């Protein structure tokens, strides 16, 4: 080098002009002054100044001496560093320094000076910046690449720059630092791990949070050098992740944080690292997998991340972790879902399936977080979540765990409020989530008080927010009510009813507290507190808190007065809110932030505060209805047809008239209702009448102008209106007018005189009107009514068949096809029953005569005159009317006493009628009477006969009714411990003697030792005993055993001297005993009480007689399988294994498709007629239900079981059997002239047989709205469905001869459904409910028709009858009708129909709970289950000619 030569030749240092020598001999100030001049000189020099470069070479060398590099003064060091930086610039590309050590010292010196950049306020900062700019621009540090210690230099430089960068620096400082550092990475041969660490450490979250500028600097550097640094980053991760060499760097423990940061900075940095993560996702180390999952959740979920589309294998591998065995990993995956849904809607499809499985996870926290994730995304934008995802939230509203259910319900409520009420995303979004309102209200059918309270809270805050202005609130309620489905409406009605009931309970409590303290009042207060407690969560704590609250009410008059205002019927919504605020304020304690006592009282106040309805609200609601009537409302905008809105508005007002009658007392309200009465829409006028009936008690006194306008309308309605309006008009007059006797007389007289049996169309309304007058004012018209019944009702109507019925093979037709004459006869029967119920006595023997008449109708299969004029559908209607009438009369004690055992047993056979609808409606009426504790206990025994029903859904319905009735009685006994004298009529176990007696007298049970008949008896007994024995409360198994033993010591009171009858009784007892012994392990213990047997049914036990004989044939032993009975209320396990997915909800239409009349009765050789029940072992059913549904009534549990429980194991269906004759000659009708009529027209030996097996449609007059919608579809198939035999008698379908085992298999196995109570308003007219109930059968009729080969059909026929009857309508055996020709065992042909068992059961393998409410009705119409026959054998049944049948 040239300088070197000079250096060697000449050691003299040349200073710039004006600068004297710089040495240690001068002062610091002077040195600084001289150095500044040197800096200026070097600053002005450029690389081309060769002379100056030569001139100042020695100065350059001198400035790099240790004297300067180690000078104590920072100003000196800074100036020297600036000079050195310029020297590197001027002399580039060669530096004047050749010694590697010297170079290292110089660069380490410059690096140290860069620390001065830290203080941006320093007067020297600009000079520090100049230094940085200079070395960055010249890339001076690149000289170090050739040095051995270069790594140390670079590392120190990087550390220095990262440590000094701060928010005081401008963009230029940042840029120069990046330039300086990036040149080292991009132009160097390698990047050491140490150097890499100095960069990456700034990305670690802890450092990142400490120094955001260092993070930004590192980020900018990595972006700039991505391509160059990527191999070194890859190597680092490879060493740590794949080879496990964590010692190579202190950052090894932060690899996953670093990967995330690097991915966010530039995904190219990790091109080779991401495949390594796929490997790590499959690691055996739980914690390691968890770390990777957390990392990838952030990477996939980041807003602009394209990782899922760029790296599909990694995405799929990640999705697999949703099913990881480690709970925290699944939890992490689920939490990630919401970010992913919000930031990447395109991935929702991939996530849906995995979230579906996780929504059924065994871990509560995971199910909970699935809901949170979906709801969070939905609240951001409803379009982010598809219907499947929302459906997962819907399913979880039935979860086993309260926390999960609560989250799901609240989530749906928030979504509903945002998108349906506030229309945050337009009408399409509102339609998408329209189902939420129904679903939330359906939850009110749950047993849990927590669920029901939450529904009430949701309703008040999210569905109809109580803080809305009155008009807006009522508009919201009006359109909500108009768009709810039937079950949601019932739930909402039930909610108001429960709140109203609780309000009255609290009012009663306040009245009791105000009374003077006595032992009686203290007991009454305690009793009332217990009742209120049952309406609050956590009854144990609630009881203590309610006692405390009672004490507060006694002591604090202010709180008591506030509460009195709150429960007053005149309390306004604003007042209610004020009262609640005041009471909670007084009870609160600022020092106690969490106050469980206050929380409980808040629950109570929330339930009783009328926050929606007051007089102003009713007025606003009426105005809203009037707007719809006038056509000025926004009905169409709200998506509700005007007619539907008006009808729903009136229905809503009708319900509120039960719960808030005082709120209707305004002239404006009554005037609007009067206008509604005059409308053409029958339903609207009907509702208006009911509202008047409920609210009109003060009309006479307070609103005389309304009274005078209303009276003529009521008169007109009662004389010429539709039947239901006539009924309500009579009840209105009874409720409103003090001169009711006069009014009734003005109506009764003209109607009575104008009754004309030849004018059938105009008879129905008068009969309904007279019937209700007779019910409400029996004494006023006692004589004319008796004469009317004896002459007109019985002689002219019931004993006359004026017109021949249409010839049809159907067993049931819709209302409009029923002959007018039959409709009149049905009303005539109802009128007689109302007359008797009004009288409430049998002094004139009218009850006895009526019962004989009704049983004669049953005996004659509905054809009272037996002239053969009445069509089969009409006969079905009359049988149903007669059976229902007996059940109605049995609810009145004076008539129950006169119903003979033979009449009771005959009535019981209606539950096995051949027509599906007769069985269905009769069962509902029976259930209604039993569940209200109105029917005596022996009527519950009738349910046992349902075990013989060929249609599985009927058996399921009967079972649920039985469970509900048993629970109702048990609950009643718990709450009324003092009613021990009524134990015999209430204790469910006492149904066993009645059941045994009924089965012993079953006309199907003919041969005492017949195995097949005994197997039927066993099935019927087990149908009842299984539910009774599900819990061995108070040692009930031993009690039942003792009862059965006691019966064997008695004789049948119905025929004490009939040896065969008594033998049957003892045989049935032995069947029961064997069931008890095979299913119970505690039956042999001592019975807690000595049972009392009903004296009407059994003689007194003979103490001298010990009946230890076993009456069962030995072959029966094999039919009693040991094992505990299944519990009736099963709350299944929370979930299936991890891979399971929930079962699809069953649609309304799918459940409506049931077995039809044609398939179940009309053709014995058709598959539906001969279905047996599946052995429960064949049903591979999941019990994995999450939560039961039940009646909304508190404390009344319902049954929830899978189909295998409902379908009891049975090999064969019963054969037709001989019937016990009834001596009709001995029965007299009681009215002299009537006796002859009945006996003349009743052929000798006329008998009634039990018939069996149809599904079909139903009456329209009192039809549920949704059933009407279904009717049109159903009726299309009527011709095929309802074709019974021409001369077929009702009875159970014959068994397959030769011991075949037909089976039935459900096509879709619904999950267990809770029975639901009809949740109408409190105490509606029983008549009204009854009429409505008769309208619930139409929907249940559609079914698959199975083809049977003609050849098989012909084989099933007897040669002697085939010529007489068409092959299309083969009769089933009449019950008890002996066939003249014996039925030998003939060869039979098996026809296989339907799927294999495996196919049917496969659907159920992953069964979760179904949306129990979808399309289901309350307990009065328990949900239907679709059935399909799997394996069917054709049966050989002897046909008989008409003569032989009628012998």
UniProtKB/Swiss-Prot annotation:
Basic and acidic residues bias: start-end ranges: 1172-1184, 1196-1214, 1225-1243, 1265-1274
Predominant cellular place of this UniProt entry's protein: nucleus
Stretch list, region Disordered: 1117-1447
Composition skew (Acidic residues), residue ranges: 1422-1432
Domain of life: Eukaryota
Induction notes from the record: By the synthetic androgen R1881 in prostate carcinoma cells undergoing proliferative arrest. Maximum levels occur 18-20 hours after androgen exposure.
Stretches with biased composition (Basic residues): 1245-1254, 1310-1319, 1342-1353, 1437-1447
Job of this protein: Regulator of sister chromatid cohesion in mitosis which may stabilize cohesin complex association with chromatin. May couple sister chromatid cohesion during mitosis to DNA replication. Cohesion ensures that chromosome partitioning is accurate in both meiotic and mitotic cells and plays an important role in DNA repair. Plays a role in androgen-induced proliferative arrest in prostate cells.
Stated family: Belongs to the PDS5 family.
Designated name of the protein: Sister chromatid cohesion protein PDS5 homolog B
Species per Swiss-Prot/TrEMBL record: Homo sapiens (Human)
Encoding gene per record: PDS5B
């Amino acid at each position: 080098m040239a300088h070197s030569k000079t250096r060697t030749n000449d050691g003299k240092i040349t200073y710039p002009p004006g600068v004297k020598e710089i040495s240690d001999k001068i002062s610091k100030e002077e040195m600084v002054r001289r150095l500044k001049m040197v800096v200026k000189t070097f600053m002005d020099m450029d690389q081309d100044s060769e002379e100056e470069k030569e001139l100042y070479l020695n100065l350059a060398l001198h400035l790099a001496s240790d004297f300067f590099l180690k000078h104590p003064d920072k100003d000196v060091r800074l100036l020297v560093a600036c000079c050195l930086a310029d020297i590197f610039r001027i002399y580039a590309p060669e530096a004047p320094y050749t010694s590697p050590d010297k170079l290292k010292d110089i660069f380490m010196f410059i690096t140290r000076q860069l620390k001065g950049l830290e203080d941006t306020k320093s007067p020297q900062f600009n000079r520090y910046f100049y230094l940085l700019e200079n070395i960055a621009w010249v890339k001076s540090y690149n000289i170090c690449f050739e040095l051995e210690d270069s790594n140390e230099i670079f590392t120190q430089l990087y550390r220095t720059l990262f440590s000094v960068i701060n928010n005081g620096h401008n963009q230029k400082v940042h840029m120069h630092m990046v330039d300086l550092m990036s040149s080292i990475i991009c132009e160097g041969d390698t990047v050491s791990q140490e150097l890499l660490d100095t960069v990456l450490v700034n990305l670690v979250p802890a450092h990142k949070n400490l120094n955001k500028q260092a993070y930004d600097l590192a980020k900018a550097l990595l972006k700039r050098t991505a391509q160059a640094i990527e191999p070194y980053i890859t190597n680092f991760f490879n060493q740590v992740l794949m080879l496990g060499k964590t010692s190579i760097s202190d950052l090894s423990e932060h690899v996953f944080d670093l990967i995330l940061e690097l991915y966010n900075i530039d995904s190219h940095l990790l091109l080779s690292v991401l495949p390594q993560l796929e490997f790590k996702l499959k690691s055996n180390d739980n914690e390691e997998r968890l770390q990777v999952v957390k990392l990838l959740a952030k990477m996939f979920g980041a807003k602009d991340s394209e990782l899922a589309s760029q790296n599909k294998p990694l995405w799929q591998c990640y999705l697999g972790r949703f099913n990881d065995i480690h709970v925290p990993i699944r939890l992490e995956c689920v939490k990630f879902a919401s970010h992913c849904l919000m930031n990447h809607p395109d991935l929702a499809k991939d996530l849906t399936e995995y979230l579906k499985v996780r929504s059924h996870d065994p871990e509560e926290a995971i199910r909970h977080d699935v809901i949170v994730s979906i709801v969070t995304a939905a609240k951001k934008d409803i379009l982010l979540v598809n219907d499947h995802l929302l459906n997962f939230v819907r399913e979880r509203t039935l979860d086993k765990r309260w926390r999960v259910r609560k989250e799901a319900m609240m989530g749906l409520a928030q979504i509903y409020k945002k998108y349906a009420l506030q229309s945050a995303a337009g009408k399409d979004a509102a339609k998408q989530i329209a189902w939420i309102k129904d679903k939330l209200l359906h939850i009110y059918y749950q047993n849990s008080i927590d669920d029901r309270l939450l529904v009430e809270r949701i309703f008040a805050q999210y569905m109809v927010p109580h803080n809305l202005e009155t008009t807006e609130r009522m508009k919201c309620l009006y359109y909500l009510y108009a768009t709810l489905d039937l079950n949601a409406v019932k739930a909402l009605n039930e909610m108001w009813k429960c709140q109203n009931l609780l309000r009255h309970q609290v009012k009663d409590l306040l009245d009791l507290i105000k009374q003077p303290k006595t032992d009686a009042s203290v007991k009454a207060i305690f009793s009332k507190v217990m009742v209120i407690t049952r309406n609050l969560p956590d009854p144990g704590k609630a009881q203590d808190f309610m006692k405390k609250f009672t004490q507060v009410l006694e002591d604090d008059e202010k709180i008591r007065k506030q509460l009195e205002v709150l429960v007053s019927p005149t309390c306004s919504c604003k007042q209610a809110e004020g009262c609640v605020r005041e009471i909670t304020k007084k009870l609160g304690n600022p020092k106690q932030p969490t106050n469980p006592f206050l929380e409980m009282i808040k629950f109570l106040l929330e339930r009783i505060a009328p926050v929606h309805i007051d007089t102003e609200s009713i007025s606003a609601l009426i105005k809203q209805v009037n707007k719809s009537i006038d056509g000025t409302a926004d009905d169409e905008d709200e998506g509700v047809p005007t007619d539907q809105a008006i009808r729903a508005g009136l229905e809503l007002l009708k319900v509120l008239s039960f719960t808030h009658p005082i709120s209707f007392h305004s002239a404006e309200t009554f005037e609007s209702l009067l206008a509604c009465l005059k409308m053409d829409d029958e339903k609207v006028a009907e509702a208006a009448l009911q509202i008047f009936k409920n609210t009109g008690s003060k009309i006479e006194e307070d609103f005389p102008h309304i009274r005078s306008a209303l009276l003529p309308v009521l008169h007109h309605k009662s004389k010429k209106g539709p039947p239901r309006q006539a009924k309500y008009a009579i009840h209105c007059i009874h409720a409103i007018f003090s001169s009711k006797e006069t009014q009734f007389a003005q109506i009764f007289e003209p109607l009575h005189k104008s009754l004309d049996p030849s004018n059938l169309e105009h008879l129905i309304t008068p009969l309904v009107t007279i019937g209700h007058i007779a019910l409400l004012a029996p004494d006023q018209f006692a004589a004319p009514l008796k004469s009317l019944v004896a002459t007109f009702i019985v002689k002219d109507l019931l004993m006359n068949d004026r017109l021949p019925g249409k010839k049809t093979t159907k067993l049931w037709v819709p209302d409009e096809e029923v002959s007018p004459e039959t409709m009149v006869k049905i009303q005539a029967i109802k009128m007689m029953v109302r007359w008797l119920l009004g009288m409430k006595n049998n002094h004139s023997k009218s009850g006895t005569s009526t019962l004989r008449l009704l049983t004669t109708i049953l005996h004659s299969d509905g054809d009272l005159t037996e002239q053969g004029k009445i069509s089969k559908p009409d006969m079905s209607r009359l049988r149903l009317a007669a059976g229902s009438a007996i059940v109605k009369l049995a609810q009145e004690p004076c008539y129950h006493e006169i119903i003979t055992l033979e009449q009771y047993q005959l009535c019981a056979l209606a539950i096995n009628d051949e027509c599906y609808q007769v069985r269905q409606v009769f069962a509902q009426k029976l259930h209604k009477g039993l569940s209200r504790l109105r029917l005596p206990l022996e009527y519950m025994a009738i349910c046992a006969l349902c075990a013989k029903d060929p249609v599985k859904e009927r058996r399921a319905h009967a079972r649920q009714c039985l469970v509900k009735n048993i629970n109702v009685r048990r609950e009643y006994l718990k709450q009324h411990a003092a009613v021990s004298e009524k134990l015999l009529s209430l204790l469910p176990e006492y149904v066993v003697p009645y059941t045994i007696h009924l089965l012993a007298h079953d006309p199907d049970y003919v041969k005492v030792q017949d195995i097949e008949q005994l197997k039927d008896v066993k099935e019927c007994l087990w149908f009842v005993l299984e539910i009774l024995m599900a819990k061995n409360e108070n040692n009930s198994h031993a009690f039942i055993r003792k009862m059965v033993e006691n019966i064997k010591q008695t004789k049948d009171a119905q025929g004490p001297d009939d040896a065969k009858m008594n033998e049957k009784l003892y045989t049935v007892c032995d069947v029961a005993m064997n069931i008890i012994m095979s299913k119970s392990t505690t039956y042999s213990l001592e019975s807690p009480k000595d049972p009392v047997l009903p004296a009407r049914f059994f003689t007194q036990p003979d103490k001298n007689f010990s009946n230890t004989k076993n009456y069962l044939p030995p072959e029966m032993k094999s039919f009693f399988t040991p094992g505990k009975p299944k519990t009736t209320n099963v709350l299944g396990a929370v979930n299936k294994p991890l891979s399971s997915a929930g079962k699809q909800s069953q649609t309304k239409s799918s459940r409506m498709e049931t077995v039809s009349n044609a398939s179940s009765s009309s053709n014995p050789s058709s598959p539906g007629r001969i279905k047996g029940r599946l052995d429960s072992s064949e049903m591979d059913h999941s019990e994995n239900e999450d939560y039961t549904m039940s009646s909304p009534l508190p404390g009344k549990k319902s049954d929830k079981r899978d189909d295998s429980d409902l379908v009891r194991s049975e090999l064969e269906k019963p054969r037709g059997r001989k019937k016990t004759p009834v001596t009709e000659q001995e029965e007299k009708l009681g009215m002299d002239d009537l006796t002859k009529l009945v006996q003349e027209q009743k052929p000798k030996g006329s008998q009634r047989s039990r018939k069996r097996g149809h599904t079909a449609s139903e009456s329209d007059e009192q039809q549920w709205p949704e059933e009407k919608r279904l009717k049109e579809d159903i009726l299309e198939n009527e011709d095929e469905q309802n074709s019974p035999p021409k001369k077929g008698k009702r009875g159970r379908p014959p068994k397959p001869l030769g011991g075949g085992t037909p089976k039935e298999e459900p096509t879709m196995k619904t999950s267990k459904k809770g029975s639901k109570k009809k949740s109408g308003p409190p105490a509606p007219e029983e008549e009204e409910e009854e009429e409505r109930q008769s309208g619930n059968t139409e929907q249940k009729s559609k079914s698959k028709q199975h083809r049977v080969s003609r050849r098989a059909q012909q084989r099933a026929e007897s040669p002697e009858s085939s010529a007489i009857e068409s092959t299309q309508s083969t009769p089933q055996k009449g019950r008890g009708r002996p066939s003249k020709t014996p039925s030998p065992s003939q060869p039979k042909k098996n026809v296989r129909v339907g799927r294999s068992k495996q196919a049917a059961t496969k659907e159920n393998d992953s069964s979760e709970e179904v949306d129990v409410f979808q399309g289901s009705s309350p307990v009065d119409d328990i949900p239907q289950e679709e059935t399909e026959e799997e394996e069917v054998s054709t049966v050989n049944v002897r046909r008989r000619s008409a003569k032989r049948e009628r012998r």
